[in-house]
Amino acid sequence: MFIRATKIRILSEIYYLRSCLINNLKPNFVILLESPQKWSDYELIDSGDFEKLERFGNYCLVRPEPKALWEKRLSEKEWLAIAHTKFTTGAGFGKSGKEDSGTWHQLKKMPDQWVIGYKKGQLDFNMRLGLTAFKHVGIFPEQAPNWDYIYENTFRISAENGKNGFARPKILNLFAYTGAASLAAKCADGDVTHLDSVKQVVSWARTNMELSKQDNIRWVIEDALKFVKREARRGNLYQGIIMDPPAYGHGPDGEKWKLDELLFEMMQEVAQILAPKDSYLVLNLYSNGYSALLSETIVKSAFHLMDKKRESYELTYGELYLTDKFEKALPLSVFTRLKR
């Protein structure tokens, strides 16, 4: 019986792979490893000893990195000779919600804010960076493969909509931060809604839109789960949904977000507002302990994909990472992408 069942499974996989080839779909049981390629304005120079040395445009920064468990290749003296500024953690380090708080120590003259660009073919946008009190600078460079995916799929759907006389595809970016993913969709002629619960962050995203010579992004300052539930009640659909939820957060009216408790509920609501055809979803997760396989299972369960023929959708999942100049790979987040 085991041999017969194995043969049936192998034949099933062969049939599935054949269907993927015919329908130009990627098989959904391969874990992908993706990293930014040929980005002139960003470089991970070295990593190790729980730190990373990065170049953003003309300026080099040292930041804490809990996943850099190995040794640095360059000496501490060499790091400090290269860096313009270094972030050191403060009293909140290790405390929930305050683990990234600390202070920047300037080593060379540099501005508090500066601009870098991202360009890959027709995908071209600018981002204003700044030194925040929580070690972040306004961009997560490892996300570049997600931006490429968002651009390519928004462009594909936009072209198909135009061919059929339909409106531009509606794209929803949840937990949207400073808007790199929103700009990727906008560059592909998406009708973009950008949602974040922090007013100052949305203002920052608007600046990035203007720096990129784009316009007409819809800005929403609201709790993400509340917004999605309302859209579901109204029957509104989107052809692209992007999610990069934090481990913890607060809505503008004090709503509490905890990833472990609310992610699956959020995904169930998102499943109701993603268009059933010619659509895509990108879920990205940074929280420690979350694997690519876990994110894939969450999406598969929320969208009831176990009940659907695999050739009717494409589900891919994997890790995003950065590679330093010494070929050390630094894994930073996991993702799942659904295309149908």
Regions found by a protein language model. Give the residues of each.
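Non-catalytic substrate-recognition/targeting regions of SAM-dependent transferases
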Residues: 40-54, 61-141, 148
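Conserved SAM-binding motif I beta-strand of class I
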Residues: 191-196
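C-terminal catalytic and target-recognition region of SAM-dependent MTase-like enzymes
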Residues: 280-340
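Conserved alpha-helix/loop element of class I SAM-dependent methyltransferases that forms part
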Residues: 141-159
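Conserved class I S-adenosyl-L-methionine
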Residues: 168-174
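S-adenosylmethionine
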Residues: 224-302
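S-adenosyl-L-methionine
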Residues: 200-240
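Conserved SAM-binding loop of SAM-dependent methyltransferases across substrates and taxa
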Residues: 178-190
